[in-house]
Amino acid sequence: MADEHQFIHDGLQRTQIDEFFSEELSRAGYGGMEVAKTPMGTQIVLKAEKPGMVIGKGGKNIRKITTTLEEEFGLEDPQVDVQEVDEPDLNAQIVADRLANALERGWYFRKAGHTTIDRIMESGALGAEIILSGKVTGARSRVEKFNRGYIKHNGEPAESIVDSGVGTAVMKLGTIGVQVKIIPPEAELPDDFEVYEDIEVEDFVEEPEGDVEELLEAPEDAEAESVGADPEEVIEEETEAEAVEEVAEEEIIDEEGVEAETGDAPTSPPDAAEEPDEALDEDVEAEAEELLDEMEDETTDEEET
């Protein structure tokens, strides 16, 4: 069988099984099914408002359903699991069957529609829509819609988020089709967004190295050492530290005073300025000695003459 025909065959088989359950389990509150084919057989999960009625006394009803699925629909080793619906008012199939039964019992369509959609919204649904089509009143068919909240009609969210169900009400004038769409409370819509507040960044604190016990013992050891030291030694150490600080302060003050006396920025030490004066004095003394020697020589020459 080609792939296209296989898809058509599987879809048709699934629709036929769904219609079978809807007719067979209408009084039990049929709420839909899930079919999964595995190598061990076909796994079917039924959702019902009253699971006890689906199973039957001693499992009689569930065995009958299993035999029918295997013989009429050709399913290999069907395994049926029944689950109870937590909130029937949020299951579109159950709501559609209830509304169809209310119309068959003689409820006015507007009262039935508004009452049903109000119960859906009170259960926490984000949105709901009910469509009644057929001979609602009179001989002419028409369409009546009831809307509440937010509903998606197309796109991927309409298939994955919206829960839909259909029902049929058989009236004297003709049939009325019932279509129900519900968006459950936990649905995440694609256009929803959330604004987060700014996160306060805390200062980075380095984690201390070592075990917790070692970190707790370290302060105790330091305190023990300080307590065990002699008071006299502690006083001597303090006085020595104070004396060193005083000497350092005096040196700083002396240096500042010298700088103020010598000028803003001395380029050479004081000894370097005195050296040229000493050289000049030596030259003057040498010249004076030479003059004295010349004068003595002149006097000696005069005496000889």
UniProtKB/Swiss-Prot annotation:
Classification via NCBIfam families: PRK04191.1, uS3_euk_arch
UniProt record, GO biological process: translation
Family annotation (SMART domains): KH
Entry keyword set: Ribonucleoprotein, Ribosomal protein, RNA-binding, rRNA-binding
Subunit-level organization: Part of the 30S ribosomal subunit.
Similarity comment: family membership: Belongs to the universal ribosomal protein uS3 family.
Top-rank taxon: Archaea
Domain KH type-2: 17-86
Gene3D superfamilies xref list: 3.30.300.20, Ribosomal protein S3, C-terminal domain (3.30.1140.32)
PANTHER family documented for this protein: 30S/40S RIBOSOMAL PROTEIN S3, SMALL RIBOSOMAL SUBUNIT PROTEIN US3
Region called Disordered, residue ranges: 207-305
Role noted for this protein: Binds the lower part of the 30S subunit head.
UniProt-recorded Gene Ontology molecular function terms: rRNA binding; structural constituent of ribosome
Biological source species: Natronomonas pharaonis (strain ATCC 35678 / DSM 2160 / CIP 103997 / JCM 8858 / NBRC 14720 / NCIMB 2260 / Gabara) (Halobacterium pharaonis)
Full protein name: Small ribosomal subunit protein uS3
HAMAP family xrefs: Ribosomal_uS3_A
Biased composition (Acidic residues): 207-262, 272-305
Keyword Isomerase carried by entry: no
GO cellular component terms listed in the entry, alphabetical order: cytosolic small ribosomal subunit
